[in-house]
Amino acid sequence: MSAQNPVLTPEKRGEDVDSALRPQTLDDFTGQAEARANLKIFIEAAKNRGEALDHVLFVGPPGLGKTTLAQIMAKELGVNFRSTSGPVIAKAGDLAALLTNLEERDVLFIDEIHRLSPAVEEILYPAMEDFQLDLIIGEGPAARSVKIDLSKFTLVAATTRLGLLTTPLRDRFGIPVRLSFYTVEELELIVRRGARLMGLGMTDDGAREIARRARGTPRIAGRLLRRVRDFAEVARAPAVTREIADEALTRLLVDNMGLDQLDTRYLTMIAVNFGGGPVGIETIAAGLSEPRDAIEDIIEPYMIQQGFIQRTPRGRVLTAIAWKHLGLMPPKDMEAAQFRLTLEDDD
């Protein structure tokens, strides 16, 4: 289990499922401008032709709106939306049950599609390409192959780790969409909208303070907003100001860059124990007593985006930004060493 601060994990939690705060249309959705513009065109074209939308693959860190976009797509297409995740589909029969219940042009959303088992993935290939199920009924000499026709549907899938998808599966998605971290300005709009829907007073600098510490992730911004609201209500404040937001987030151990204790431990360990790196991911995982996947999927994407670390062939290396944030002096030969590592990376 990860020791990351629960309010900063981008993974989905029960309190995050608040349909009232979710945008309902692509026009309401903030951020990801290029992806939204393209999706609008693809949806309009599919509706004009009366066809199912081509299969869509969302790629990006958790908490950026992949599930929300899938729901919006179904709504704008005027079709049913069904949702599941890779780990839930344990057997080929589970997938067959889902697919045979879909109606014409329905949207099926599979989160964490990289966690599908190979046996289930094999069933998915003909379903995506030919809208047919190829099932083996029975065992041994009595086994026979049965083909079942499916309604033409749209598979919308999401993954945080594109490299774990097999090439045959990846190639069957006609519309790949990569989502990126949000800017502070975009998150500020999301925080203001959330506060308005909650009936919560919010000053401009209060919204900006929350947005600044939300790690570029709307899900985290929403969670921080709910926690700051708790502090504001108990203090009987008429509105969330920068001072209230700062006090609340500091008490929640979220620093001014959105880092928590685990993030700081990560950076400090590389700085103090390994002289700023390079250090391998397995060594970092052992030192933090955290699973490698949690470090690669949750901690590092934001670190890289903010310029705190570099990934090199020899391991992770702290940048000058990280040393400054920690308040530590980097090694004198750091710049020369990083230049050599960059050259190796280019090779």
From Swiss-Prot:
Family annotation (Pfam families): AAA_lid_4 (PF17864), RuvB_C (PF05491), RuvB_N (PF05496)
Protein localization: Cytoplasm
Cellular component terms per the entry's GO annotation: cytoplasm; Holliday junction resolvase complex
Binding site for ATP: 21-22, 63, 66-68, 129-131, 172, 182, 219
Keyword hit for Hydrolase: yes
Enzyme Commission (EC) number: 3.6.4.-
Residues annotated to bind Mg(2+): 67
Annotated region (Head domain (RuvB-H)), positions in chain: 256-347
Family recorded in the similarity comment: Belongs to the RuvB family.
Entries under PANTHER family matching the protein: HOLLIDAY JUNCTION BRANCH MIGRATION COMPLEX SUBUNIT RUVB, PTHR42848
Assembly description: Homohexamer. Forms an RuvA(8)-RuvB(12)-Holliday junction (HJ) complex. HJ DNA is sandwiched between 2 RuvA tetramers; dsDNA enters through RuvA and exits via RuvB. An RuvB hexamer assembles on each DNA strand where it exits the tetramer. Each RuvB hexamer is contacted by two RuvA subunits (via domain III) on 2 adjacent RuvB subunits; this complex drives branch migration. In the full resolvosome a probable DNA-RuvA(4)-RuvB(12)-RuvC(2) complex forms which resolves the HJ.
Name this protein carries in UniProt: Holliday junction branch migration complex subunit RuvB
Species of the source: Allorhizobium ampelinum (strain ATCC BAA-846 / DSM 112012 / S4) (Agrobacterium vitis (strain S4))
Lineage: Bacteria, Pseudomonadati, Pseudomonadota, Alphaproteobacteria, Hyphomicrobiales
Name of the gene this protein is made from: ruvB
